[in-house]
Amino acid sequence: MRTNPTTSSPVVSTLEEKNLGRIAQIIGPVLDVVFPPGKMPNIYNALVVKGRETVGQQINVTCEVQQLLGNNRVRAVAMSATDGLMRGMEVIDTGAPLSVPVGGATLGRIFNVLGEPVDNLGPVDTRTTSPIHRSAPAFIQLDTKLSIFETGIKVVDLLAPYRRGGKIGLFGGAGVGKTVLIMELINNIAKAHGGVSVFGGVGERTREGNDLYMEMKESGVINEKNIAESKVALVYGQMNEPPGARMRVGLTALTMAEYFRDVNEQDVLLFIDNIFRFVQAGSEVSALLGRMPSAVGYQPTLSTEMGSLQERITSTKEGSITSIQAVYVPADDLTDPAPATTFAHLDATTVLSRVLAAKGIYPAVDPLDSTSTMLQPRIVGEEHYETAQRVKQTSQRYKELQDIIAILGLDELSEEDRLTVARARKIERFLSQPFFVAEVFTGSPGKYVGLGETIRGFQLILSGELDGLPEQAFYLVGNIDEATAKAMNLEVESKLKK
């Protein structure tokens, strides 16, 4: 039985004797349970249904109380399939919310919404557990300092820097490199910040969850030989799960991240893929509970639900949780209530471009569409701000000239525009970077580029000092010194060929 690990076993047995209810009604994943007078469970309490099916199959379903209906009835949402449940079955009130394992024992493992390992690697140490429902940190505990979270990825740090303890939206279609970018961030936070990551797979395809796990093992983010040295914990509630599980799996991942922040005092990266599915699951549960739908059929509690998740993702004086959330935009409609509610909480957006991916420029982050509230002179400094603006202006001018180049060719441009195009093409290539996690696929070693080095490199390109170098010298290199070295090698090679 999945008892609440925070309660000792004698208490559980008395709870089982005292607080037993019975199923009165089952509608899909929603159960109505009748309790004796005066023994009603609290909202968000975990209920456990145990028993046997008619064919003798063992049943163990955990539910969460969502509504108190009156007449000693509560309405609960199941966290797993309700097949085989019948009216009259006994329901145990655990007396506390769902609790999940936290701490170092979670690293390198895959969990479901209940905090149970699903990777067939044996049980997890459950001595340290934490309830998934908690209030956000008090205002006095928050760290109000606006500081940049250096990722070591040039295009991100220069043009759309992440805020330490901020929330970032990751926009991109299939096959443009979201997973590789996520894995590189997990790798870099572990190496540069000594931090850990938690990945919450919310309502996405099970194939994607499996692929991510395999790629993490291949790239060393999950260390198979020594699980304790892994840098990430995975929590999955995929498309095949009932809406209750998909709605709560984000909170399970967040609870694990909060422990690393508050107790271990670490910098944590929390990935949520996909935040839209969290809203979608909430909408399904809301309809099942009989609530009147609001705008576009979404739940009336949309803003509150989103807020209760997002407000727990923050920096405190102990550590920080920086969250990167993949955002699916239904029918590409940015005004849809789900993405619109998400945007209100984001500090930065990283947009991946299929055009750049097709050119082979990875990471395929669009330098013009990606934005950040941190890119202000008073936060990043005048030098960083000026360099970023000039890079954007040069890229924008190149974009405007592309139609003319396609029709008339480069020769028809003015001298000034030709120079702008040459520098913009160098910038475009210099924004690419070899990743540590892609080493196994590309064969070229990964590079972590500090912010100072990044700014220096782009200043040299913009100043015209490197106008004589071929543009391919800037492709897939780390800092600017590597680009000049690569240019010399290319020159030597071309002389040898002649």
Swiss-Prot record:
Cellular component annotations (GO), alphabetically ordered: chloroplast thylakoid membrane; mitochondrion; proton-transporting ATP synthase complex
Chain residues that bind ATP: G172, G173, A174, G175, V176, G177, K178, T179
Pfam families (alphabetical): ATP-synt_ab, ATP-synt_ab_N, ATP-synt_VA_C
Transcription regulation as UniProt keyword: no
A molecular function (GO) term: ATP hydrolysis activity
GO biological process: proton motive force-driven mitochondrial ATP synthesis
InterPro entries attached to this UniProt entry: AAA+_ATPase, ATP-synt_VA_C, ATP_synth_F1_bsu, ATPase_a/bsu_AS, ATPase_alpha/beta_chains, ATPase_F1/V1/A1_a/bsu_N, ATPase_F1/V1/A1_a/bsu_N_sf, ATPase_F1/V1/A1_a/bsu_nucl-bd
Entry keyword set: ATP synthesis, ATP-binding, CF(1), Chloroplast, Hydrogen ion transport, Ion transport, Membrane, Nucleotide-binding, Plastid, Thylakoid, Translocase, Transport
EC top class, as a word: translocase
Compartment(s) of residence: Plastid, Chloroplast thylakoid membrane
UniProt KW Iron keyword: no
PROSITE patterns: ATPASE_ALPHA_BETA
Name of the protein described by the UniProt record: ATP synthase subunit beta, chloroplastic
Organism of provenance: Chamaerops humilis
